[in-house]
Amino acid sequence: MIKVSNLSFSYNANDEALRNVSLEIPKGSWVSILGHNGSGKSTLSKCLVGLLSPTQGEIHIDDMLLNDLNLPKIRRMIGIVFQNPDNQFVGVTVKHDIAFGLENQCLPHDEMAKKIKHYAELVGMTEFLDKEPHQLSGGPKQRVAIAGALAMEQDILILDEATSMLDPEGTEEIIGLIKRLNKEYGKTIITITHDLSFAAQSDYLIVLKDGQIILEGTPKKVFAEEELLKSSHLELPFGLSLYNELKKDEQVDKNVLEALWAFNSEM
């Protein structure tokens, strides 16, 4: 469980990036935090992992207060993968990059090798272990960055705009991996995004605008507020907008509506 209470953050006196944000993220859920550029969503993600210290409010991870004293413990519980994985790579090869965090744990070499093999297999990167990360295309790069985070065996994983630089094929790869991590491995997943098609597949949505939560709920509940989303510069994909329009017509069969929703929320 992640609990955020009255969180505010300012980069300077005239720039309040977050204002009195309160939210709860249940263990084992997949939550998407939505917002246009400058909404505060990436600032929030950095606060959650302790990269930024809030000017006001508290964050609890599994009932543990995030502060300087608890930060080392918190970082063993929660990891983050940024939009551009090139900014995270530190290893000469994929194998060395996955191993980087493990080396800091002073694990025996054989145990480290097992973990590298396991997480490379999990993200489908076994055949690339001896490749340089920077030689890979977008989707494989993200999978390497995710493998490095998974190797730390944290229960919570934040993906900040993980698909924004990917083509449709790369996006589908990452979505499939997220679903597997969430459903099969019980990871709590937090995705930071402005892509509503992507967010439709998560369990719960939180919408930020100007550093404040303006809307939250299940995808169906949030996407029903189409005008409010538009005011936040978030456009529903055609299929989801069509669903909203057809829902207003009482003559449309409910089974048709449910099929349309299922199709668009699994794209």
Predicted regions, residues:
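The feature captures the beta-strand-to-loop junction immediately N-terminal to the Walker
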Residues: 34-36
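Helix-to-loop junction immediately C-terminal to a conserved catalytic motif
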Residues: 49
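Conserved ABC transporter NBD signature motif
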Residues: 57-65, 74
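Conserved ABC ATPase signature
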Residues: 132-136, 140
